Structure formats: C-alpha cells, structure tokens
C-alpha cells in the first residue's frame, strides 16, 4: 500500500508543478489586486455591464486561487504523512490518505483539461440549444433528460444557467430549449457537445414495452463581446413578436414580449422569451444572432482546414456524436473518440461528462 501511495504521490507532484505553470497563481494574484482596486473606485458601477464582468472575473480568480491553494495544501499533507513511517502504517490514516488522493487526482485532472482549452473563445460564456429529433413524445422526453444532465454538469462547474427560450412538448418533455451558460471556460467545455445525441431504451410511453431509438441535437455557440465585429444589415433580418408560452403552449405573458429574429442570408433563426420586456428580449436575440453568425464563420473556416488536413481527424458538424444505451445493456459511447462508460446513471447525473469532454479535447482540441 505504501509503495502504491509513493507512486501516486510522484504523479501528484508532477501534476501540481504543471498546474502551477499553466495557472500562474502569482500572476492571477496580481490581476486580482488590480481588479479589486478598480472595484472600490468611485463611479465603478456607472457602467453596469463592465462592472458586472469585472465582478465575475474577481469571483473566478478568487475561486481559482482558493482551489489551487487547497490542492497544494492537501498534496503537502499527503507528503508529510507518507514521510512519517508510523502514521503511514496506520489503517485509519491510510483510509484518510486514500480520500485525499482521490480528491487531488480529480482536481489535477480538471486542471489538465483546462490546459487543453487554448482557443480564442474558449474562456467565454456560451449558448447551448437542445432540439428534439423525430419521434414525438419520446424525443421530447429525451431532450428533458439531456437538459437535466447539462444542468447538473453546469452546477458542478459553478456556472450560472439562464433559460433563454423554451418550447415544451405537447404530452411530456421539451421540444426545444436554449440555455446560456455563464462562467469562465463554459464554451471551451461545452463545444464538445455539439452534434446529435442518440438514445436507445425501452420507452415508458409504449404500452408494448418495445425498444425505441430517439435523437436530440445539441448546438453550442460562444457569447461574443462588442470587440468582435459581426455585420448585420437591417434589411437582412425579420423581427417577429409573440406571447411567451409555458407548458402545453399556455400563455404566461399577456403582452407580445417574446421576440424571434430571422436572418435571411444564413437562414439562422433565434428567439428569446426569458426577459420581461420586448426590448430586452430583442437585445438578447441580437446578441445570440451575432454569436450564431460568428460561429457559422468559424465552422466554415474549420471546414476549409479539414479539406487541407490530410492526416488528421475531421469534424463533421451536426453529425451523431454519442450513443446512450439503457437497454438491453447500459453503455454510453462517444463515436468520435471511442471513449465509453457503463455507468449510464452517473452520466445522466452529469458526473462523467468531463471525462468525455477531455477525451474529445485531447483528439480535437487543436482544431476547434
């Protein structure tokens, strides 16, 4: 047992050193001090949007530094007790050391994943849309299951989740939903989820208990700021207003506050019914439209790179990316990377999603 702990400690120390180099805690402490000084200056909240971003950055820096210091202290504690011959032989102490090892190894893996996120927009927040495929109620129920998985996963990363637009199924589930994941590296992680997710199970809506196949498509696009120029001509769009709807199409707002914008050159359609006023929903729609158009430009650039790349893997946008099999056996398998797990319940609880994303980033991170 002691020899096994020694080997694991070597790996932890190496991982901690790599984490320190990539995180640059000293640099982040200096950045934190500068931002905190700005936050106490008079007139800081005159520009609410800018102040909000700075406040979020301060909170994120504090969280990163706190997590790194906790990791560093735990590794030091493990090292101290392993060097103490008497303590390392104690069975209760070995149990405690195992818990500390598991925590540190998990945290090191998270930092390793962050090192793979080097894209120009990877640190941004993002929009994530889920749409039901053919299959009626069964597919709508699958969308709701996928939504639950992403909600739990986002919570584990301490990202804020906003529901931008939602259309419930006629019997059960959800036909379409758009979320905004607000937090650092939300896009870097979530971009791996774009594509079609396939479900195989015995349908609870089928009295004959037959096995059904359902599909849900996921689309992820980054939030972009005003520094990125996306040209949208007024004549290229149509703006429609309608009443916000709840489950079963029931109106939840007596005014036409919901907004839908259609962009003719690309065929992109975005909608928002989350905000209280039509003006706010229109602004949110325009932000989404800018992001969608920019994402389309990125995809076109990526497709050109794929043509020029002969010996590297290609990405097929909108293709099936993952299978979720509930019956006759349990298996989740990513068709792009080959990564798979048998614990489908943990997957649907959002607990194993990061492992799939890391496998994707290892294979595709350099070209996304």
UniProtKB/Swiss-Prot annotation:
Matching PROSITE patterns: RF_PROK_I
Q: Which domain of life is it from?
A: Bacteria
As for PTM, the annotation reads: Methylated by PrmC. Methylation increases the termination efficiency of RF2.
One Pfam family, short name please?
PCRF
Kindly list the GO CC terms recorded for this protein. cytoplasm
The subcellular location is:
Cytoplasm
Q: Name the predominant localization.
A: cytoplasm
Q: State whether keyword Protein biosynthesis applies.
A: yes
The protein's UniProt keywords, in alphabetical order, are: Cytoplasm, Methylation, Protein biosynthesis
Q: Which family does it belong to?
A: Belongs to the prokaryotic/mitochondrial release factor family.
Enumerate the PANTHER family for this protein: CLASS I PEPTIDE CHAIN RELEASE FACTOR, PEPTIDE CHAIN RELEASE FACTOR 2
Q: What does this protein do?
A: Peptide chain release factor 2 directs the termination of translation in response to the peptide chain termination codons UGA and UAA.
Per its record, how is this protein called by name?
Peptide chain release factor 2
Q: Write down the species.
A: Chlamydia trachomatis serovar L2 (strain ATCC VR-902B / DSM 19102 / 434/Bu)
């Amino acid at each position: 047992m002691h020899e096994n702990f020694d080997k694991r400690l070597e790996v932890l120390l190496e991982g901690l050193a790599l984490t320190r180099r990539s995180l640059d805690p000293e640099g982040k402490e200096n950045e934190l001090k500068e931002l905190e000084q700005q936050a106490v200056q008079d007139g800081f909240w005159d520009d609410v949007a800018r102040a909000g971003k700075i406040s979020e950055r301060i909170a994120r820096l504090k969280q990163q530094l706190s997590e790194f210091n906790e990791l560093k202290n735990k590794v030091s504690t493990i090292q101290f007790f392993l060097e103490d011959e008497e303590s390392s032989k104690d069975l209760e102490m070995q149990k405690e050391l195992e818990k500390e090892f598991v925590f540190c190894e998990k945290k090191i893996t998270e930092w390793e994943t962050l090192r793979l996120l080097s894209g120009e927009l990877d640190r941004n927040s993002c929009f994530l849309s889920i749409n039901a495929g053919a299959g009626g109620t069964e597919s709508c129920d699958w969308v709701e299951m996928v939504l639950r998985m992403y909600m739990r996963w986002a919570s584990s990363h301490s990202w804020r989740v906003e529901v931008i637009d939602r259309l419930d199924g006629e019997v059960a589930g959800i036909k379409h939903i758009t979320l905004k994941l607000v937090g650092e590296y939300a896009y870097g992680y979530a971009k791996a989820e774009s594509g079609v997710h396939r479900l195989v199970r015995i349908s609870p809506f089928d009295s004959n208990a037959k096995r059904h196949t359902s599909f849900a498509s996921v689309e992820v696009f980054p939030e972009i700021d005003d520094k990125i120029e996306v040209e949208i001509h007024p004549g290229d769009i149509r703006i429609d207003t309608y009443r916000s709807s709840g489950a079963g199409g029931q109106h939840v707002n007596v005014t036409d506050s919901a907004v839908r914008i259609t962009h003719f050159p690309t065929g992109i359609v975005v909608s928002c019914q989350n905000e209280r006023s039509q003006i706010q929903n229109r602004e949110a729609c325009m932000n989404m439209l800018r992001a969608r158009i920019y994402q389309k430009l990125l995809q076109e650039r990526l497709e050109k790179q794929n043509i020029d790349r002969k010996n590297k893997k290609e990405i097929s946008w909108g293709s099936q990316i993952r299978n979720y099999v509930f019956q006759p056996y349990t298996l989740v398998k990513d068709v792009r990377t080959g990564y798979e797990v048998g614990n489908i319940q943990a997957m649907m609880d959002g607990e194993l999603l990061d492992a799939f994303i890391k496998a994707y980033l290892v294979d595709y991170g350099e070209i996304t």
